[in-house]
Amino acid sequence: LKADIIIVDLGAGISNNTLDFFNLSSRGIVVTNPEPNATQDAYFFLKNVLYRRMRLFAKINEPIKRAFDDYIDRNGNGMFDFGGFREFLNRHQQGARKEYNNFLNEFNPRLIVNKIRSIRQNGEGTWFINLVKTFLDIEMEYLGGLRFDKRITQSSEKLFPFIYHFPNARITKGLFSILSNLNGIDLPRHEIRTFKQFRTLLKEQQKQWH
């Protein structure tokens, strides 16, 4: 498939397949809305994605593996907390802390906030990015927000793209603004040309968990 960017809608959930597909992407995009339940789900999704990435990274990075195992042993309850792990590295594993920083710097997902209904909710994107930075040490990029528009539902019911029928609508202009930010210049190129190659890559990654 000849394309500069391919977008796959993974849907909601934190199944291993969803997490692995997200981790296979060059830079995953999280789409949420300002409702508390939605932002909470988005945060826990990113937390699970990061944890799965780190467990895989620990299998190929000995300092991180030792630090992770040591942290779990000292913690006593078998639970993992990113903030606690960060403090543990700062106190006991300075060498692994550098490796951990490099690992985090390679994960920069993007964010879109959908169904914004008020001026106050315009700040939800920045708030969420700051939350993720504080507790997960992840640097996210905010692609933009989209205002709530009931015409989206109408378009969906009639099975036609709203951008064609409402080209001057605020949400259409907002969508094109996001698309202008979604460039492929900084994205690594995948040397994958067929679905068979993609399926093979996914199976190889899944083997790492067994």
Question: What are these language model-derived features?
Answer:
Residues 1-21:
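Phosphate-binding/switch loop-helix module in NTP-utilizing enzymes
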Residues 64-210:
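C-terminal lobe/tail of nucleotide-utilizing enzymes
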Residues 5, 27-30, 110:
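Well-ordered beta-strand positions
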Residues 15, 47-50, 133, 183:
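Signal for well-folded cores of large energy- and translation-related assemblies
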Residues 20, 24, 41-45, 127-131:
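Alpha-helical scaffold elements adjacent to nucleotide-binding pockets in ATP/GTP-utilizing enzyme cores
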Residues 16-19, 40, 154:
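Alpha-helical elements of the RecA-like P-loop NTPase motor core of helicases
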Residues 11-13, 26-63, 69, 76-87, ...:
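Conserved Switch II/interswitch segment of TRAFAC-class P-loop GTPases
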